């Protein structure tokens, strides 16, 4: 008598996708971080989109817009906390995903590794562009945190950091 999960037409699909998945025997929970990265990214995009509908970036009204989101917008408080904690979770999953690849020697497969390094550089470039590249309109915190390693370069570090910042334009707490 055959097992129902292998003979029933609908259950057979679920069985071949989840139970008898054709995967290596050494696969572990470490291999879930790529999927978790996708979930975190989708969460960041959705919550960020809804938060941006109510946020004001002017330094005089930014705090009031955040309190408006938390108090007056339906489930605004949970959107804010999901967005903030989702960003942390995204980077935790990112570092664990790269760490898993390093641990298991995935860098030996150069094509696959380079396909993975490309989105990593894209994430870093997005962070850089979001905080530093709008010359004259950048966040002081973002500019100093992202470019503080540049200022450690001997002789040219300070000038290089100021050039990346766009001169002495870093002055306010928010992007306006």
Swiss-Prot record:
Additional free-text comment from the UniProt record: Heme 1 (or BL or b562) is low-potential and absorbs at about 562 nm, and heme 2 (or BH or b566) is high-potential and absorbs at about 566 nm.
Homology family: Belongs to the cytochrome b family.
Positions of heme b b562 binding: 83
Membrane topology type: Multi-pass membrane protein
Function: Component of the ubiquinol-cytochrome c reductase complex (complex III or cytochrome b-c1 complex) that is part of the mitochondrial respiratory chain. The b-c1 complex mediates electron transfer from ubiquinol to cytochrome c. Contributes to the generation of a proton gradient across the mitochondrial membrane that is then used for ATP synthesis.
Cofactor note: Binds 2 heme b groups non-covalently.
Binding partners and assembly: The cytochrome bc1 complex contains 11 subunits: 3 respiratory subunits (MT-CYB, CYC1 and UQCRFS1), 2 core proteins (UQCRC1 and UQCRC2) and 6 low-molecular weight proteins (UQCRH/QCR6, UQCRB/QCR7, UQCRQ/QCR8, UQCR10/QCR9, UQCR11/QCR10 and a cleavage product of UQCRFS1). This cytochrome bc1 complex then forms a dimer.
Protein name: Cytochrome b
GO terms for cellular component: mitochondrial inner membrane
């Amino acid at each position: 008598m055959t097992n129902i999960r292998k003979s029933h037409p609908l259950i057979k699909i679920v069985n071949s996708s989840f139970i008898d998945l054709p995967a290596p025997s050494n696969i572990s929970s470490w291999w879930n971080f790529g999927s978790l990265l996708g979930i975190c990214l989708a969460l960041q995009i959705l919550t960020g989109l809804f938060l941006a509908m109510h946020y004001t970036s002017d330094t005089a009204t930014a705090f009031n817009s955040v309190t408006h989101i938390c108090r007056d917008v339906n489930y605004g408080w949970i959107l804010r906390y999901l967005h903030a904690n989702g960003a942390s979770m995204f980077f935790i999953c990112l570092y664990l995903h790269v760490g898993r690849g390093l641990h298991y020697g995935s860098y030996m497969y150069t094509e696959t590794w380079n396909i993975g390094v490309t989105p990593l550089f894209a994430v870093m470039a997005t962070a850089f562009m979001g905080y530093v590249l709008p010359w004259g309109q950048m966040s002081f915190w973002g500019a100093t945190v992202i470019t503080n390693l540049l200022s450690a370069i001997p002789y040219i570090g300070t000038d290089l950091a100021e050039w990346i910042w766009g001169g002495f334009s870093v002055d306010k707490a928010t992007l306006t």
